[in-house]
Design a protein with these regions (language model features):
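Substrate-binding and catalytic surfaces of secreted/luminal carbohydrate-active proteins
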Residues: 32-76, 181-183, 213-221, 225-231, ...
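Extracellular glycan-recognition/adhesion modules and their associated mucin-like linkers
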Residues: 488-512, 527-554, 568-594, 612-617
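Aromatic-rich beta-strand patches that line glycan-recognition/binding surfaces
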Residues: 516-522, 557-563, 598-604
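N-terminal low-complexity, Pro/Thr-rich disordered segments
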Residues: 11, 24-32, 482-492, 617
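Short beta-strand/loop motifs in extracellular/secreted proteins, especially
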Residues: 420, 432, 444, 454-458, ...
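Secretory targeting and sorting signals
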Residues: 1-31
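Residue-level detector of short, conserved catalytic/binding motifs and their immediate flanks
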Residues: 72, 86-88, 125-132, 179, ...
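N-terminal catalytic cores of secreted or lumenal carbohydrate-active enzymes
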Residues: 49-229, 250
């Protein structure tokens, strides 16, 4: 069909009511007898560590118009959506990277196989989020920073990471291009601190500026190696702990450092890496994060990425409390280690996976990806932490790798839930805990765990159909099915808007939730790509308006859908050069890239092809 350039004058709501938002319209009819794939993991011991069945595919079952009754019922409703999934994984600590690479424990072929099993989405479990220490941590062979020489950054170098951490991170990114990479510091260089030690101590105020540049140099050095850093936190676990690399802060200091040192350094270097605050437990929120979220200069800055949580203390429901107060603040679970102190590791992991994501987390990240048979090497701190794999080094099984229960529990998420998926509604059930997701391609994944001591029959209802399954005790399950995505063709008066590579402007996962990312995606005629241009200057889909997040005109600000409110952030003007403009900036495909899932943002108008848009006549 012919296309024409269009002209419009278009405005964005800033904050929404908390809670669940429902996509308008009923789902399309589903295919009868939809096949459901089933994957199970079972342990046999009281500690939940002896894997007798690890992510084993079972005989598929099928949806039917009716199915037998069951003791437990789970209703899956893909028309109610929550947060977007960004990834799951662990950390390339110095310990993990050295064991897997230069320790000599693994042959090259074994290392290649291990990396594929960890990061390959098809031949492995598709880990999609890693959080690496920015310098030394407790799971390292020794203390180090990237510049150990006072009193400037002329000696800055990432040579330490070039040996093991960076090559493996680069390989992981090649195996899974959707991989998100986060960096967290345990300590500033010792010479910047009042005690001249990596362990504890305070950052001296005269070095705030240099420490901000230290972050920037790290990000630039990794970028130069082809490894972009998506997120940083200011400090891992503020004020914790003695005996290994760590650093003291107070909230006012962190607040000042972010606004006066870190972000100016990022802007001077042209860095768009997002900053996550807290990176600590739920019970630390009031002390470390609440004042930062209350600061609109931080919360509304394009360099702010959200809040990072650890799961070692407090109540996970704190995350929902915070979400309800700040619905536009993204939440990430960035560390919860496995360990020998945990009574049942499988139960712990499945509770974490389900509870964290039901409380708005966009990630689930364990601690060290690997440790050896002695839970090390370690640099003080945790000598009982476990990983997704155990690398035997120097013992009778040297060179062998054990895939722990944590590998399989993580795989129940990352192998089947792709970055860009949205959590969808499913019935909470204490006997069979569960969480459900809808992938960008419309497929579904229901993750469940039988918490009881006996087999449970479970009836799953979806789209007017159901299936019944007997789930054994001590068993994790992921059920997947293709499904027919909700919605249909373009609504009355709706038009497709196309951009770079002929891809369509698309609402991710067809979700009408406030804050849903707008992206490029292969044109498919769905309601998520059906846009109505209003005489009032708005562009609408799924009953919401195309919106610039927080009405910020900063380069890199997210473009989303939001309740229509008549503000300037939803007022778009189309120009004869093919650009769409709001707040003085152009609608822009990041990258520039035409890959499915490429997020849209606003940026200075450059005349580039990633800022040209057409609407179907």
């Amino acid at each position: 069909m012919p296309f024409r350039r269009f002209r419009l004058a278009l405005p964005a709501v800033l904050l929404a009511a908390a809670g669940t938002l429902t996509v308008v319209g009923a789902p399309a009819a589903q295919a009868a007898g939809e096949s459901v794939n089933v994957w199970l993991t079972t342990t046999s011991d009281s500690g939940g560590r002896t894997v007798t069945r690890g992510l084993q595919q079972q005989t598929p079952v099928s949806f039917a118009a009716t199915s037998p009754g069951a003791a437990q019922t789970i209703n899956v409703n893909e028309n109610t959506t929550y947060q977007q999934f960004e990834g799951g994984g662990a950390s390339f600590t110095d310990t993990a990277a050295w064991l897997m690479n230069s320790s000599g424990a693994l042959s090259a072929s074994t290392r290649t196989s291990v990396m594929q099993k960890l990061f390959d989405p098809v031949n492995g479990i598709g880990l999609s989020f890693i959080r690496n220490p920015l310098g030394s941590s407790d799971l390292a062979r020794n203390n180090y920073s990237f510049d150990d020489t006072c009193c400037d950054l002329n000696g800055f170098s990432i040579n330490h990471d070039l040996a093991d951490v960076l090559p493996l991170t680069k390989q992981a990114k090649a195996l899974n291009p959707a991989l998100k990479i986060m960096a967290s510091p345990w300590s500033a260089p010792a010479w910047m601190k009042d005690n001249n030690s990596l362990n504890q101590g305070w950052l001296q105020s005269q070095y705030y500026g240099l420490y901000g540049e230290y972050f920037a140099k790290y990000i630039q050095a990794y970028q130069a190696q082809g490894v972009p850093i998506d997120y940083v936190s200011v400090q891992n676990e503020p004020t914790c702990c003695a005996g290994y690399p760590s650093m003291q802060w107070n909230t006012a200091g962190i607040q000042y450092f972010i606004k006066s040192a870190l972000w100016p350094a990022f802007r001077n270097a042209g860095i768009t890496t997002k900053t996550l605050v807290n990176d600590w437990n739920w019970d630390a929120y009031n002390t470390w994060a609440a004042p930062l979220l209350a600061d609109t200069a931080i919360r509304n800055d394009p360099l702010f990425g959200g809040i990072a949580w650890h799961g070692y203390g407090g109540d996970v429901a704190t995350q929902t409390t915070v979400h309800n107060q700040y619905p536009q603040v993204n939440a990430y679970m960035t560390e919860h280690s496995g360990g020998t102190w945990i009574g049942n590791q499988q139960t712990e992991d499945m509770n974490n996976l389900i509870d964290y994501t039901r409380n708005w987390d966009r990630s689930w990240v364990k601690w060290s990806l690997a440790v050896d048979q002695n839970h090390g090497p370690h640099n003080g701190g945790c000598d009982t932490c476990t990983g997704l794999i155990t690398v035997h080094n120097g013992d009778g099984r040297s060179g062998q790798v054990d895939y722990t229960i944590e590998y399989y529990t993580m795989g129940h998420l990352t192998k089947f839930v792709r970055p860009g998926a949205y959590r969808i509604d499913s019935t909470a059930n204490s006997a069979v805990k569960n969480v459900a997701w809808k992938n960008p391609d419309g497929s579904k994944a229901l993750i469940a765990y039988n918490t009881t001591g006996s087999t449970q029959t479970v009836k799953v209802n979806w789209g007017g159909q159901s299936f019944t399954y007997s789930l054994p005790t001590k068993t994790s399950a992921t059920f997947t099915w293709a499904g027919t995505p909700s919605g249909g063709g373009s609504g009355p008066g709706g038009k497709a808007i196309t951009g770079l590579g002929g891809k369509c402007v698309d609402v991710a996962a067809a979700s009408s939730a406030n804050g849903t990312q707008v992206q490029l995606y292969t044109c498919n005629g769905s309601s998520a790509q059906s846009w109505t241009v209003g005489a009032d200057g708005t562009i609408r889909a799924l009953g919401k308006c195309l919106d610039v997040a927080a009405a910020s005109s900063a380069n890199g600000t997210k473009v989303q859908i939001y309740d229509c409110n008549g503000s300037a952030a939803q007022s778009w003007t189309a120009n004869s050069d093919g650009t769409l403009r709001a707040l003085g900036k152009c609608l822009d495909a990041t990258g520039p890239s035409s890959a499915d899932g490429t997020p849209l943002q606003i940026w200075d108008c450059t005349g580039g092809s990633n800022q040209k848009w057409t609407v179907q006549a």
